[in-house]
Amino acid sequence: TINGNTVPVHPSGGFAYVVPLSIGKNTFKIKSGTEELNYVIMKPPAPPAGTYKAPELKEFENLKYALVTNDKSPLRSTPVDSGINRIAHLQKNMPLVIDGEKGNFYRVILGSQKTGWIWKGNVKLEESGESLAELKGYDYIDSDEFFIFVFHLDKMTPFELVESSPFLIKFYNVKNYPDNTYVMDFPVEKSMQKGKLLGYSGQFSGTDFILKIRKPVITDEKQPLKNIRIAVDAGHGGSERGTTGCLGDREKDVMLEYAKLLEHELKKRGADVIMTRKGDDYKDLNERVELANSENALFFISLHGNALPDGKDPNANSGTGIYYYYNQAKPLADDIIKEMTSQLGMKNDKVRQQSFAVVRNTNALSILIEIGYMINPSDNAKMINKDFQKKTAKAIADGIENFLKN
C-alpha cells in the first residue's frame, strides 16, 4: 500500500503508481507485508508567471556576411533550435549572407526566394563578403555501390538535398541561375529499385561538393541479408544508464542483451554486422553514427527501452514504437514494426518522425526502436524475458528482410 491505498502489483513483482504532489511537504508511507518505508518529497510552488515577449524579426538595412564556425551546424527552416526543421547541416567556414535576426538566430539568404535560420552561436560575422558563388560544372563518377556527382564551385555555398521524386540537389546563392538557385534532379523512380532511396550523402571537399547516392542493392532471393552491412546500436552505455525498469533493470544493460541477440540473428542470415558497442562502455552519439558510416552500413538500428516524463502515468502507455528522421527510412520502420507487433503481441505505439541524433544520418537508413516501456510493469516483464528477447531479434530481422524483398 501507499498511504493506505492498495497498489496493483504485476505478477513479475513490478508496479507503477502515480500520486499527484501537493505544493509543500508530501509524506509517503509505503508498506509491503511487514516492511515499511517512509519518504518525504517537497514540491516548491510554481514561479510567478512572467510576461514572455516573443522575439521580433529585425531586418538589416544592409546585408551582413558570416562564416560558419562549427561543423554540422543546422540550417533551419524556422528560428527554433529543435524539431524537424533542418534544411541542411553546414560545414565549418561556409560563407553565409545574413539579412536579419530574430532572437538567437540570424536569417540566412537562400537564393532570391527563400530564407533559412542559423543559431548565432554557430557563426561569426565578417566585415565583408561575396553574395553569389559560381558553379563551373560537374563530373559523374561511376562506382560499384554509388552514383557519385562532383560539383565544381568557386566557394562553398548553402545547399539542400530534397528526398522527393525526383531527388533534388539545390545550391543556393549561385549566379547565372533563376532565383540564384541551381537545381539538379536525380530520377529515383528510374534509377532505384522500386523507387526506394537507400542512403545518400553530400558535403564539400574544398570548394567541390560531392554527392553520393547508394545504388540499388542486389539481394539473394533465398538469403536477402547475405553480405548486407547493418549497424546495431545498443542504446546508452557506461556512465549513461538510460531509464530504469520496474524491477531495477537498467536500459543500457538490457539493450546490450538485445543487440547481441540481434547481431547473432543477422549474422545467421548472412549479414555483416557492425556493433557500435560490445560492452558496458560510453559511446558518443556522433561516434556511433560515424562508425556506421565508416563501415558503409546500409542500415542503422538503434535499440532502446522507452520511458515517460515525470507526471505521466506509466500504466497508460505501452507498446513498441519506431522513430526515423529522413523519409527514406520510414518504409523500413513500417516493415519492422509490423513484424514486431504481430510476432510479439506488443501494442503498436506507432512510427513517428523525430529529431534524434542517431537517426539524423542520411548515409544509412537509420531508425530508433523503442522495444517497449521499461517503466510499464507489463512491458518490462516481457522485455527482460529471455525468450521474448530472442523473438524480438527474429522479428526485427524479418522486418529488414521484408523491406529488401518488397
Task: Give the ranges of each region predicted by the language model.
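Solvent-exposed loop/turn segments at secondary-structure junctions
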Residues: 124, 236-240, 279-283, 305-310, ...
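Active-site-adjacent mobile loop/cap segments within catalytic or ligand-binding domains
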Residues: 295, 299-302, 307-309, 321-324, ...
